[in-house]
Curated annotation (Swiss-Prot):
Domain spans labelled Protein kinase: 484-742
Database matches in InterPro entries: Doublecortin_dom, Doublecortin_dom_sf, Kinase-like_dom_sf, Prot_kinase_dom, Ser/Thr_kinase_AS
Region (Disordered): 18-128
Active site: D605
Coiled-coil stretches noted in the UniProt entry, renumbered to this chain: none
Residue stretches of biased makeup (Low complexity): 18-52, 100-128
Molecular-function GO term, any one: ATP binding
Residues where ATP binds: I490, G491, D492, G493, N494, F495, A496, I497, V498, K513
The protein's name in its UniProt record: Serine/threonine-protein kinase GA29083
Ranges annotated as biased composition (Basic and acidic residues): 53-66, 74-84
Residue ranges of every copy of the Doublecortin domain listed in the record: 157-243, 314-397
GO biological process: intracellular signal transduction
Organism: Drosophila pseudoobscura pseudoobscura
Amino acid sequence: MEVHNSLHCTAPVLSSLQASASGSGTPKKTAASSAAAQNSKQLLDQLSQQQKAQEEAETHSRRDCDSPASSNSEPEKDLDELRDLNGSLTGSGSVGKSNGSLSGASSTTSAPAGTSTPGSANTNGSASGAASLSVVSATAHLKKRITSSRTPTRKAHRIKFYRNGDRFYPGITIPVSNERYRSFESLYEDLTRLLEENVKIPGAVRTIYDMVGKKITALEELEDGQSYVCSCNNENFKKVDYNTSSQPLANLTLANNSRTSSHRLAKLQRPASPLKNGVLNSIAPVPVGGGAAANGSPLNTSRFSERDSVVHPRIVTLIRNGTKPRRIIRLLLNKRNSPSFDHVLTAITQVVRLDTGYVRKVFTLSGVSVLQLSDFFGSDDVFFAYGTERVNTVEDFKLESEEQRAINAIRKTLRTAGTACKGPKPKMPVKSKKAYPPGELKAQAEAQLQASAAPANEDEEQAALLKSTGVEVAELPAAIRDNYTLSQIIGDGNFAIVLKIKDRQTGIPHALKIIDKSKCKGKEHYIDAEVRVMKKLHHPHIISLIMDVDQDTNMYLVLEYVSGGDLFDAITQVTRFSESQSRIMIRHLGSAMSYLHSMGIVHRDIKPENLLVELDDFGNVVQLKLADFGLACEVTEPLYAVCGTPTYVAPEILLEVGYGLKIDVWAAGIILYILLCGFPPFVAPDNQQEPLFDAIISGVYEFPDPYWSDIGDGVRDLIANMLQSDPDVRFTSEDILDHYWTMGNEEIGCGDYSR
């Protein structure tokens, strides 16, 4: 290891050492001089050990040393000077190679023999004392330089980080240095982990801003003692009065071994929501490492355990105080914007926009004052919002007919439980792509084998199998042809076919997707986007990409194989699923969507055909995986391209007003509805698109009897929140996982559905 801060004996230090040597050459050495010699000897030993360690390190690595000899010259020189100094103090040796030999006798001034010299004793004594002080000063100076050479790293900056747009969050303070964080990605990872432990965030930290909204692009721009704002999922900077006066809830300073701590969970095991990453945790959060909270703060534990036990996603209706008829607004409350009572007031303030400013008072429809967080998540779902103005309890809490009609229209979808279905039962839409039902796969494979007339070898068998697909065996990439054996066709679409293949060594089945580029003219960017997105994904409920090979005519993707087929075929066979089976599937789908959305990726084509299922021996679904990322893309701004499958398309896509991640939630709501009753909520005669699109845009649907008579209110509430026409109040993918029905806590409830 190269010593960058080499030791240098300056001229004043050397002169003081020489003076101490001449003073110590008198016959009468003082006790102070002896002590100085002792200190100098100890210092010499320290420097010798340092030089030895340096030489050993240099034998292993000389990468950054242009001149090893020159790099050692200064420490060696200092070492020689200290050796000479030590010899002088003990009465022998010479001081300094470059300064010539200086013996102890020649450095003293004594009177001739027999001559009386008054005061000579005092002179020698004072010189000895001065020399001792000089030696002590010199050794202290050198010790300081030795210490500095051993600690070349600079002190880490202590920096506070806030959550973007959260004016109540007190922030976290962590040390930041180039030694601790080699890149922004490692800093983002730690900030994401720390924020998830204290507040609900919509995804991973992706951007850091200073307090005026300037984007930080390099670690060197972070200044010691300053504050910065963390943004998730490419959010724009929100200029609010951040809580700079409050102390953090807990000391969240990272320990030096935080990167390798056994208490730190991997990202896949640290869901912001219990089901985010496909694992159902208990309702009460279990602190990492045992009893106390992960950051050791009792206050932190009590605050967030209250939030987790009280807060669940729901949409509330707000009546803005003002001239009648008053404005009525809807607001989605969840664990991300409602961790405390003050946070809810802030969220209400931002949507109602009172003339008097900040919302100070909230009342229920019956006039009861809302004083605590749990009041927003009880039986009441309509609230009056006031500022500092006076409340007239007699007139203000009386709804006009126009206001009552508006509230009833909002509740309409929750009042259709007793509606009888008129006419025949609606049907499922036609499958949007060709696929072979599971029962026909075996027959198809047998027919192909018989038609091949018992091929002489495996190569001929594979050639016969590919013949109908238009793909020649010789065209297959060597990496696929040499490592996998081809099996039956398990599906095809407009641009691709899918074959079942097996690993020649392990026998593990996979799926081979062959995309015909000639059929994708002008749409090649979709193929590139699919591969690019899938390479980023690693999740238990998302199909894994194992290998991709790009050729001039075809793109070959080796994918994870799921034996149960797709969900569309499963629905066709059983017609409808129980609530418990539907809960399993929506958990897995919500987990996959939450993972995608945390990375800023929207799927854009969620439908039963793109959901693959694993079945147990009794035909029950035990696992669901999301597949086919041909339309997936990263969202950095509103999207306007009209795409997807008609039955599952969200209204904002049809209206072409711009859309984002929540179109996936709409599609998942349609699927959940289908799972429970066997048909979609929006239908049109003969699957005509225009009437279907009109129905989707209207947002009006029902839960008709007898198909919904045995289905509970909890899942109806979840569907109603997933199928909100306004994307601002529609559930997020995390809200799906946080909903009490999804978590199996239907005793919590969410209001009265009989109104």
